[in-house]
Every structure is written in C-alpha cells, then in structure tokens.
C-alpha cells in the first residue's frame, strides 16, 4: 500500500514537472515560431520532467520522504528512462529532422536517420575508451556503460559553464569594470552613424538616377541602326553597369560600417544605463555581490589547481568539513552531525534551484541566438539532450556535497562508477574554462576603449 502511495506522489510530481516544461517550451522557446512537430515538444517536456525528478529524489533522500525501497525503485526507473531518452530517442529524432530538411534524402529519411543514429552510437561508445570511468566488473550491456559516458559529456558541459560563469558573474556585476561613457561619446558616435546613413542614401540616389538614365537611353536608342550603332550601345551599357557595380560595392561597405556603428551605439547606451544603475541601492548590492563572487572565483580556481596538482578529492562533504574546522578552532560544544544535515539540505536545495534556473536562462538565450523556422526543431532536441546530460552529471557531482549516509542509495543506483575521476575531470575543465574566460574578457575589456577612441 505504501508503495502505491509513494508512486502516486512521484507520478503527480512528474506530471507537474511535465506541465512546467510544456509551458516553458510554449511561452519561452517557441513563442515566436510555429510548432510543426508536437513530438519535439513532448520529448523536451518529458526530458525536463525526468531531469527534475532526479533532483526531487535527492531532496526526498535527505528529508527521508517516501519509503527507502520506493525511492530506490523510482531512482532506478527514472535513470533508465532518462538514459533511454538521451542515448536512443533524442539522437534518432535529431538525425530524422536533419534528414527531413534535405530534399534529396526526403524519401529515404528513415534509413538515413538510422545511419546517423548508428554513427552517433559509434562515437558515443568510443568516447569511454580514453577515460578510466568504469569498474572492470561491468559488462558491455550494463547501465553503468551508458551513465559513465553521459556523465563525461555532462560534466564537461557543467565545468565549461561553471568556469565561464565564475568569471563572467563578477565582471558583469562589478562597477569597477564599467567603461566611463559620457553623453558626448554617444553623440559623437551617433553623428558618425547619421553621416554614414546620409552617404548611403546619396549613393543609392545616384544609383537610381544612373539606372533611370540608362533606361531612358535604352528607350531612345532601342533599335540601333547599323553595326557601329550596335557597338556603341554595347560599350555605353557596359561602362554604365561597371559604374553601378562600383557604387553598389561602396554602398555594401557603408552598410556594414553602419551596422557596426549601430551596435557600438547600442553598447554605449547599455553601458551608460549600467553606470546609472550602479549608483542605485540595488546596483550597489550587486556590486558587493560582484566582489564576493570574485573572491569565490579566485578561491575556486585555487582549489581546482590544488586538487589537480595533488590529485586530491574530498572524502567528506564541504559543509561537514567546514563546521568541523570551525568547531575545533573555537573549541565549542556543537552537534556537527545534526546541523550539517540541515545545512547540507539547504545548500543542495540552492544548488538545485540555481542549476535549473541558470540552465533554462542559458538555453533560452542560446535558442534565440541560433534558431530559425527550419532549424528550430533540431535545436530544441539538442537543448533537450544538453539539459538531460547536464542534470545526470549534476547528480554525480552533487553526491559529494551530501553527507555520507545520504550517498548510499545514489551510489547503489549509479553503480560502481569511478566518482573520483568525474571530480578531477570537472576541476581540469573548470580551470581551463575559467582561465580562458579571464583571457577573453581581458582582451574584450582592453579593446573596448580603443574602439571608443577610434575616429
């Protein structure tokens, strides 16, 4: 009876997650596009539902909600379904929609879709060869084979996003990095933009006048008399077309310049708004957060370097370790086990909420940046693939943030994976991503004033 009640709770929560994923799909991703394939919407919503269910089961594990055997069953079932979606269903449909957009392959799209899926499976399987991700006990058809490979891709994505976010967040929030933009700078750039637009209009007028003159001459000398008249008309039209071609090239160059000037003007306006915003109370609060995140970024890079150099992986969760150090230093009586459980629950909850929110914001921006009416179905499926792999690998990494007694069932469900490898791999990719982001933002920040000062 308790299993039925537990299952009804899980099914209800999955329906709610599915509905939220459906609404997000309709209201955010596809609000400007026509939905042609409902299977894409269903796959995205199902992936989102089962991804969120894994985080829900982590919270249930800490709070002790549901029976232990029920949690284990739903962990196992949830993991099997999400792997089925990520390894078999989504890659096949991505190949199917890619082939469907190619007219030459339209009649045999099912065959070519299967070939693309088999190609994906080959490279997906070969991905595990260079990495020590599995125990030798596992067979070739075990579920751990799939989890381990999905985990490598997902952890790589997480580390790349985390490394960039750890650097970009303080750069975005701190007023220290803002350029000093005045109204004079904006007016000067706007004047250049207007001058460029005037030049484009005048040259287009010249082109229109030249075409009109050529058309009128063509009507007057419509039927040239004799051989020399024909030669004259041909040479006149050739020289006129050459002039038009040269003017058109000048117009194209000026239009490209006007686009760049417009983007620079918009950037100056955005920077000026950020300067005004930084003077408000909320702006000062985010500026303080920027300093806090910059300290966190330096600490995270330092710890990642230490972990890589000394091949170190923590045995206890960070909360318990931090409380133990504080209690021993102050020499006070404190129930470390009791409070570490509650603080770990809050920490894991914050990690889960920020992970879901941050990923959804990133997916929305990414979708609008590269999507079109033809490619939107393929891109949504790619986003579903990234989202699923991201959440599966989040479970692998969040496991280390939980006290030891709560890790048992997750370890049993995920199998005997080499968990230490994933943490070391995360540190390596995080460090590379963070240092690359620092270099990129430094060069971008250095070039911005030079652009502004350019005549």
UniProtKB/Swiss-Prot annotation:
Instruction: Please tell me the species this chain comes from.
Output: Homo sapiens (Human)
The GO biological-process annotations, alphabetized, read as:
intracellular pH reduction; positive regulation of canonical NF-kappaB signal transduction; protein transport; T cell differentiation
Chief localisation class: Golgi
TM spans (from-to): 5-25, 46-66, 79-99, 114-134, 150-170, 290-310, 343-363, 378-398, 425-445
Q: Which reaction does it catalyse?
A: iodide(out) = iodide(in); chloride(in) = chloride(out); bromide(in) = bromide(out); fluoride(in) = fluoride(out)
**Does the keyword section mention Protease?**
no
> What does the function comment of this entry state?
Voltage-gated channel that enables the transfer of monoatomic anions such as iodide, chloride, bromide and fluoride which may function in counter-ion conductance and participates in Golgi acidification. Plays a role in lymphocyte development, probably by acting as a RABL3 effector in hematopoietic cells.
Tell me the Pfam families matching this sequence: ABA_GPCR (PF12430), GPHR_N (PF12537)
Q: Its topology with respect to the membrane?
A: Multi-pass membrane protein
GO MF, one term, reads:
voltage-gated monoatomic anion channel activity
Where along the sequence do coiled-coil regions lie? none
GO CC annotations, alphabetized: Golgi cisterna membrane; Golgi membrane; Golgi-associated vesicle membrane; monoatomic ion channel complex
State the compartments where it is located: Golgi apparatus membrane
Instruction: Give the InterPro entries listed for this entry.
Output: ABA_GPCR_dom (IPR025969), Golgi_pH-regulator_cons_dom (IPR022535), GPHR/GTG (IPR015672)
Top-rank taxon of the source lineage equals Eukaryota
Tissue localization of expression is:
Ubiquitous.
Q: Which family does it belong to?
A: Belongs to the Golgi pH regulator (TC 1.A.38) family.
User: Can you name this protein?
Assistant: Golgi pH regulator A
* The protein's assembly and partners: Homotrimer. Interacts with RABL3; the interaction stabilizes GPR89A.
Glycan-modified residues: 180, 243
Q: Print the miscellaneous field.
A: Does not seem to be able to bind GTP.
Please verify whether the record's keywords include Membrane. Answer: yes
Give the keywords, sorted. Glycoprotein, Golgi apparatus, Ion channel, Ion transport, Membrane, Protein transport, Transmembrane, Transmembrane helix, Transport, Voltage-gated channel
């Amino acid at each position: 009876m308790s299993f039925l009640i537990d299952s009804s709770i899980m099914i209800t929560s999955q329906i709610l997650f599915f509905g939220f994923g459906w609404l997000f799909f309709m209201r955010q991703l596809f609000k400007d596009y026509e939905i042609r394939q409902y299977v894409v919407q269903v796959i995205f919503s199902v992936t989102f539902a089962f991804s969120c269910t894994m985080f829900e089961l982590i919270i249930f594990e800490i709070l002790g909600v549901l029976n232990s055997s029920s949690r284990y069953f739903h962990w196992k079932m949830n993991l099997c379904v999400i792997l089925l979606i990520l390894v078999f269903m989504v890659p096949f449909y991505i190949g199917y929609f890619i082939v469907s957009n190619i007219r030459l392959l339209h009649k045999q799209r099912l065959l070519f879709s299967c070939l693309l899926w088999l190609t994906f499976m080959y490279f997906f399987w070969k991905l595990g060869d260079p990495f020590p991700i599995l125990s030798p006990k596992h067979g070739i058809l075990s579920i751990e084979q799939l989890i381990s490979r999905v985990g490598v891709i997902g952890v790589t994505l997480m580390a790349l996003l985390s490394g960039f976010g750890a650097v970009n967040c303080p750069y975005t929030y701190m007023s220290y990095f803002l350029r000093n933009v005045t109204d004079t700078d904006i007016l000067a750039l706007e004047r250049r933009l207007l001058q460029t637009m005037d030049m484009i209009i005048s040259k287009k007028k010249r082109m229109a006048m030249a075409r009109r003159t050529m058309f009128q001459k063509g009507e007057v000398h419509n039927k040239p008399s004799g051989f020399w008249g024909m030669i004259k008309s041909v040479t006149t039209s050739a020289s006129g077309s050459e002039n038009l071609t040269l003017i058109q090239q000048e117009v194209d160059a000026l239009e490209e310049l006007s686009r760049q000037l417009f983007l620079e003007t918009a950037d100056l306006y955005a920077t000026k708004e950020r300067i005004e915003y930084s003077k408000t109370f909320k702006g000062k609060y985010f500026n303080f957060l920027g300093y806090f995140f910059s300290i966190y970024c330096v600490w995270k890079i330092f710890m990642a370097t230490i972990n890589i150099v000394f091949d170190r992986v923590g045995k206890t969760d960070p909360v318990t370790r931090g409380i133990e150090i504080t209690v021993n230093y102050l020499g006070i009586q404190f129930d470390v086990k009791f409070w570490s459980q509650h603080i770990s629950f809050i920490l894991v909850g914050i990690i889960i909420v920020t992970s879901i929110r941050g990923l959804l914001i990133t997916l929305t921006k990414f979708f609008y940046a590269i999507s079109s009416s033809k490619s939107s179905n393929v891109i949504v499926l790619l986003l579903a693939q990234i989202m699923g792999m991201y959440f599966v690998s989040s479970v692998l990494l969040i496991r280390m943030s939980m006290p030891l007694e709560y890790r048992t069932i997750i370890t049993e469900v995920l199998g005997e994976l080499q968990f230490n490898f994933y943490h070391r791999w995360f540190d390596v990719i995080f460090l590379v991503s963070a240092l690359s982001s620092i270099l990129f933002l430094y060069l971008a920040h250095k070039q911005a004033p030079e652009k502004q000062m350019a005549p």
